[in-house]
Amino acid sequence: MVAKKLKKQLHFTLFTFPPFVHHYPDGWRHPQEMLGGIYNPLEPEIWARVARTLESMKVDAFFVGDGGAIYNSNENSPSTSLHYGSQTIEFFAPQFVSMVTAMAPTLGAVSTVNTEELNPWTFSRMAQTMDHLTKGRVGFNIVTGLNPGGLADNLGVEVREHDARYERAEEFLEVCYALWQSWDSDALVRDKERSLFADPKKVREVNYNGRHFQCRGPSQLPRSPQEIPVLFQAGQSPRGRQFAARHAEGVFTISPDLPAMQSYYRDVKDRLVNEGRRKSDLAILTGIFPIVGSSESAAQEKYEQLVELATPEAGLAWCSGYASYNFAQVPFDTKLSE
């Protein structure tokens, strides 16, 4: 008997940094933009409407980014980011995800979580709580480096080198895995006759003692619906791709053109096999930026308006934040090497 070939499933998510909702510098100035005055994006009603719209469209998930801090690398100050609105205000992603999943009871949601910001005990509890309360509808985008400088400034720590952050993240997830699996699936008994709430023989201490983290455990919660929540990754570097191949079930990526997308796809899938996993174990979500209008010409006009609104200063603050580098010290016409 010949095995049937599995059909590929197309997945859609909406990716945004609420209440900041776009990826165009100065895009908030567009007449139809939410941050431009049509709606107050800090109020929950608009996001409930967005979530329910996504739910009705059968979109897989609301994918929520989180930069962790106001970008302050440009001129070593947050002033330019604040002035031009360069990805400045952001909700704490896990709490936002908790709200939208309550507003849209069948919608999936993915929260970005920075391993440099949280410790594994806090994150593991948060993830299990959300997994239980959403009945398994949440995932987490594990990142290590978006705006590392701004985040480190607010935590009072040194900025770790790129690969060192991934090394720490590996240990971070090791602790989480151990905590999430510290209860057997049948450990919660609730037997009134025997006065047995949970079977101690089926709940284990973790006793993790690593270079970066120490944790005794066990988890404070029994196993959640997914046991291990769906993990995503969004790293573009070779180290980030390796991390994704080892841990993720989904990857979010942005590529400049089709050949770059195909190259990224092949590389990550090959790394997946090298980790002993199947290529089908990980979905790759490639970002697109649709400009929507009542007609093609209307959409083109909107695109041209967005380009016209963008200022070099806003873009510079944005790039400086992403790279944690003060690009203001580099002349605008300087060609940057890799």
Sequence positions of predicted segments:
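Conserved, mostly hydrophobic/aromatic
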Residues: 12, 54, 58, 100, ...
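Hydrophobic faces of well-ordered beta-strands that scaffold small-molecule active sites
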Residues: 10-16, 62-64, 107-113, 136-142, ...
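N-terminal beta1-alpha1-beta2 module of alpha/beta enzyme domains
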Residues: 2-103, 226-229
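Hydrophobic or amphipathic alpha-helical targeting/insertion segments
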Residues: 103, 111-154, 160, 168-172
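Active-site mouth loops of central-metabolism enzymes
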Residues: 26-45, 111-121, 157-163, 225-238, ...
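Active-site-proximal loop/turn and secondary-structure-junction residues that shape catalytic pockets
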Residues: 18, 68, 115-117, 144-148, ...
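An alpha-helical appendage that flanks or caps ligand/catalytic pockets
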Residues: 3-27, 35, 163-226, 259-338
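Catalytic cores of nucleotide-enabled group-transfer and carboxylate-activating enzymes in metabolic
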Residues: 69-70, 88-92, 99-112, 233, ...
